[in-house]
Amino acid sequence: TLEFLLLLIKSEAFRFTDKSKRSLFWEAHYLLGHKEKIESTLSLFKSSKKSLKLPELISSEIEDAYDQLELFGFSLGHPFRLFTEWQGQESVSIKDWSKYLNNHIQVIGYVVTIKNNITKHRQQMQFGTFQEFSGDLFDTVHFPMTSNKNIIRRNGIYILKGIVKSDLGCFNLEVISAYSCARLPDPRYN
């Protein structure tokens, strides 16, 4: 059906055709989007089907990423490409955290998951797993004093400042502050 074909086009299943998604949408609607007219037997002239000639329709990588986000709940490409404000910021690589044990650092990460907890004193705290730009994962602890000011609410890129700690040989970041980077505007609706 047309609906399923449009979903396949939107998910970039037809990349191999080297046609843009917009061109494929038009072709799909042209071929499947209307009902065939029943030819009357009394027509004087037989009309031929018109061929479809479209201008170059271009879509951007950001549009594709937002389509994927809408369809799957995540982008198939690098998650950092949908955000701004993190470029040019200092970020200590996870591979170097051993040099910064019990010291303050800044790291930039994409939220993989957040677990919200309530302490025995009825205060909120969070545990998080983030992905660094290189793809490496790191864990964070957000104690109540900082969690109340810097709640991680949704997936996105965060600039995290905190203290590197080691627990049973695994490094984690005890977060002091978390700044949420802005998402690029969706060009499909501009």
Predicted regions and their residues:
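Single-stranded nucleic-acid-binding OB-fold domains
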Residues: 18, 76-189
